[in-house]
Regions:
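Short glycine-rich anion-binding loops that position phosphate/pyrophosphate groups of nucleotides
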Residues: 45-47, 69-70, 99
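Glycine-rich phosphate-binding loop
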Residues: 27-59
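Ferredoxin-type iron-sulfur electron-transfer modules and their immediate structural context
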Residues: 131-132, 144-232
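Short alpha-helices
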Residues: 77-142
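Anionic-ligand anchoring segments at beta-strand to alpha-helix junctions in alpha/beta enzyme folds, i.e.
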Residues: 1-40
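Redox-cofactor binding/interface segments in oxidoreductases and associated redox assembly factors
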Residues: 42, 65, 116
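ADP-ribose/adenylate-binding Rossmann-like module
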Residues: 56-82
Length: 233
C-alpha cells in the first residue's frame, strides 16, 4: 500500500513542493503530515538556509541532498544546525549532483527521474532491480511517442540516479557545530505590519505556520495590502 500527499505553495511555478509518501503492508489511513521520516530528500540546496530540511528525520534515517559539493564544500556550506542534527541523530547522509547528471544525458534541469531512482536505491522500499524495471517500463510508456532518444534519456537517468549518489562520512566534529543561521526580521515604520510579518508571514513562509497558536491571528477578515512584498523577507 502507498499514500501520497503533495503540499505546495501558491507560487506553484518555481515554488516549493513537498511530497509526503508513506508505504506499508496494510491500508494507510493517516491524515496528517509525516513528522518521523525514514527518508528525506532535498532537491535544491538553497532550501537548507530557509527550511528545516532534516528536523523531521527519525534517528538513523537517511537524508539525500542534491548538490555539486564535495566533502570540503559540505563542511563549509551546510548550516551548523543541519550538521549538528545529522551527527546527533546518526543520520545517513548522501549527496548526488542531479543537475550534472541531467545535463550529461540531455535532460537539462529535469532531474525528477534521477532523484526518484536514487530514492528507490537508498530507501529499499522494494528490491532495487524491481524499482528500476518498473520505472523504465513507465518511462517507455510515457515517452514512447516522443521517440526512442527521449526514452533512452529517461532510462539513462534511472540508471545514473541509482548509482550516482555518494554516502558521506559524517565527521564527529559536527556534534559540536553551532547554529549559525540568520533569523530574518521585518522592520519598518508601520508597527502593525511589522508585527504581522514577523509573527505570521515569516513563520508561514518557512512552513512553521502549523505551530502558530490561534491567538496569533487577527480576529477580523482583512489582510495587509503589502504582503506580496513582505512575503519575500
Amino acid at each position: 500500500y502507498a499514500q501520497g500527499y503533495f503540499d505546495y505553495d501558491s507560487k506553484k511555478s518555481g515554488g516549493l513542493t513537498m511530497s509526503h509518501l508513506r508505504f506499508g503492508h496494510t491500508p494507510i489511513k493517516s491524515t496528517y503530515y509525516i513528522s518521523q521520516a525514514d527518508f528525506v530528500a532535498c532537491h535544491n540546496p538553497a532550501y537548507l538556509e530557509t527550511y528545516d530540511m532534516v528536523q523531521d528525520l527519525k534517528k538513523g534515517g537517511s537524508f539525500l541532498l542534491n548538490c555539486p559539493w564535495d566533502a570540503a564544500e559540505l563542511e563549509e556550506r551546510l548550516p551548523g544546525k543541519v550538521k549538528k542534527f545529522i551527527a546527533d541523530n546518526e543520520i545517513n547522509l548522501y549527496t548526488i549532483d542531479g543537475f550534472k547528471i541531467g545535463k550529461e544525458i540531455g535532460l537539462g534541469t529535469r532531474i525528477n527521474t534521477v532523484l526518484q531512482s536514487a530514492f528507490f536505491s537508498i530507501a529499499k522500499i522494494i528490491p532495487e532491480e524491481d524499482a528500476i524495471k518498473y520505472m523504465k517500463d513507465a518511462a517507455t510508456k510515457s515517452y514512447s511517442k516522443e521517440g526512442e532518444a527521449i526514452v533512452k534519456m529517461n532510462h539513462d537517468a534511472i540508471d545514473r540516479g541509482a548509482t550516482g549518489y555518494v554516502k558521506v562520512e559524517v565527521p564527529a566534529s559536527w556534534k559540536n557545530a553551532v547554529d549559525d543561521s540568520v533569523k530574518h526580521v521585518a522592520t519598518g515604520d508601520r508597527p502593525d505590519l511589522v508585527e504581522y510579518v514577523n509573527n505570521v508571514v515569516i513563520p508561514v513562509n518557512t512552513f512553521h505556520g502549523k505551530d502558530l497558536p490561534v491567538s496569533t491571528f487577527e480576529t477580523v477578515s482583512y489582510t495587509h495590502l503589502t504582503l506580496p512584498t513582505n512575503s519575500r523577507v
